[in-house]
Design a protein with these regions (language model features):
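Short amphipathic
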Residues: 4-12
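C-terminal edge-of-domain segments
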Residues: 60-83
């Protein structure tokens, strides 16, 4: 997936719930309609980001993907701040 983004958050090596905790902090620093790209190695982050996007009123999950990076699969999440 080649989604444009405004800021990158590297959450590789962090376990649940830290990728989501750090993403929430970063998304608060973005302007509305900017996109945060999060890369994580925690498989559970896929469901975590989906759940967050369903309940949060200020974010939209615009894409998710799995990419190889350094011999490891990383989970990539694109989150847009909408408010």
């Amino acid at each position: 997936m080649n989604q444009p983004f405004d800021k990158l958050l590297d959450a590789r090596g962090l376990n649940c719930p830290m990728p989501l905790v750090n993403a929430r902090k970063e998304i608060a620093r973005l302007e509305p309609f900017q996109v945060l790209k999060v890369v994580a190695t925690d498989r559970g982050s896929v469901a975590d980001f989906q759940g967050w996007a369903k309940v949060a009123k200020n974010v939209e999950l615009v894409g998710q993907d799995t990419e190889p990076m350094g011999g490891v699969s990383v989970y990539v999440h694109y989150v847009k701040r909408v408010a």
